Curated annotation (Swiss-Prot):
Organism: Prochlorococcus marinus (strain MIT 9301)
Subunit structure: PSII is composed of 1 copy each of membrane proteins PsbA, PsbB, PsbC, PsbD, PsbE, PsbF, PsbH, PsbI, PsbJ, PsbK, PsbL, PsbM, PsbT, PsbX, PsbY, Psb30/Ycf12, peripheral proteins PsbO, CyanoQ (PsbQ), PsbU, PsbV and a large number of cofactors. It forms dimeric complexes.
Keyword Membrane set for record: yes
Residue ranges crossing the lipid bilayer per the database entry: 25-45
GO CC annotation: photosystem II reaction center; plasma membrane-derived thylakoid membrane
Name of the gene: psbK
Protein name per Swiss-Prot or TrEMBL: Photosystem II reaction center protein K
GO BP annotations listed: photosynthesis
Sorted UniProt keywords: Membrane, Photosynthesis, Photosystem II, Reaction center, Thylakoid, Transmembrane, Transmembrane helix
Taxonomic classification: Bacteria, Bacillati, Cyanobacteriota, Cyanophyceae, Synechococcales
Propiece residues: 1-9
Length: 46
């Protein structure tokens, strides 16, 4: 099963230049999640 996931984890050759961007993409929802807490702290958790 691990071999199957490893096969899909590699980007095609044409997209190798975008590898650093693709590595950061999963973190974007986490930034929004943290932004919710910062926003609520700013308005006093109403």
């Amino acid at each position: 099963m691990l071999i199957l996931f490893n096969t899909f984890a590699e980007l095609p050759e044409a997209y190798k230049a975008f590898a650093p961007t693709v590595d950061v993409l999963p973190l974007i929802p986490l930034f929004f999640f943290l932004l919710v807490f910062v926003w609520q702290a700013a308005v006093g958790f109403k």
